[in-house]
Amino acid sequence: MPDTTVAQLRWRCRRGMKELDLLLGEWLERRWDGADPGKRRSFQWLLEQPDPEIAAWLIGGLRPGDAGHAALIDDIVRHCH
């Protein structure tokens, strides 16, 4: 998704759970501009996942198997909790 705009990402951060809306939206606003391309791809990947999985990673303490995705989860939890 190389042509995805911040406005499109902001819209995709709106989920079915208020907690996810806040965490994802806050990371986008605080960290997106300074994120490297790998972290940006991981964030776009994260937005494609079902809400229960995202909640398990961000709130439930579980981790995705991919190291890059896990690093993004750690970054969101560290900077947006």
Residue ranges of predicted features:
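Positively charged, polar, low-complexity stretches
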Residues: P2-H81
